[in-house]
Swiss-Prot record:
GO terms for molecular function: SNAP receptor activity. Residues 9-30, 68-95 form a coiled coil. Involved in transport from the ER to the Golgi apparatus as well as in intra-Golgi transport. It belongs to a super-family of proteins called t-SNAREs or soluble NSF (N-ethylmaleimide-sensitive factor) attachment protein receptor. May play a protective role against hydrogen peroxide induced cytotoxicity under glutathione depleted conditions in neuronal cells by regulating the intracellular ROS levels via inhibition of p38 MAPK (MAPK11, MAPK12, MAPK13 and MAPK14). Participates in docking and fusion stage of ER to cis-Golgi transport. This is Golgi SNAP receptor complex member 1. It comes from Rattus norvegicus (Rat). Residues 41-51 have a biased composition (Basic and acidic residues). GO terms for biological process: endoplasmic reticulum to Golgi vesicle-mediated transport; inter-Golgi cisterna vesicle-mediated transport; protein transport; retrograde transport, endosome to Golgi; vesicle fusion.
Amino acid sequence: MAAGTSNYWEDLRKQARQLENELDLKLVSFSKLCTSYSHSSARDGGRDRYSSDTTPLLNGSSQDRMFETMAIEIEQLLARLTGVNDKMAEYTHSAGVPSLNAALMHTLQRHRDILQDYTHEFHKTKANFMAIRERENLMGSVRKDIESYKSGSGVNNRRTELFLKEHDHLRNSDRLIEETISIAMATKENMTSQRGMLKSIHSKMNTLANRFPAVNSLIQRINLRKRRDSLILGGVIGICTILLLLYAFH
């Protein structure tokens, strides 16, 4: 019976690790999609990406479809990983083995932390993508209104020129903001990679500590002996100092 429950726990851990690996790859691709969308809108800043007839619209709709598809896939993976974590939580409560319960809870907490990080990263990247797309739609609408006004009136007066200059200035500022967002997202990907590496190192250290408890016990005894020797040495030095002072003032 114990072997069966142990195999069930290991199977859940295997499923969790597999889903976490899939989510990691999906989130990296999702972040790159958002970055490429930002770069494409920045490259089109010098010309109206909404005034052309077919190609930009097709590219935009293709990216939108890809975004929706990847978002659905990531949400499904997050839901599956949540289900596996819930099963692991049920197992820890019904294991009935106090000596193993702490180790199981520690493993479960690590998987929960990873799920929380992936969920936060997904929602943040999705929000950035939606903000960029809404901003592009707004700027394209303004540009179309300006072009419609120019073609309808046929008068290139001073007010229109000032309005266009202000619009171009806003687009340049928007391009700088998008470049800053891209740099921040690249930095975030690097930090995420380093965080995963540190978690892996921490997990290996915990595994070694749990596998070799005698090493921890030996280190604690050595530290205790050092502390005791320091106290004895300090006491001897204090007594000698007092005796010397008494002798000097005698």
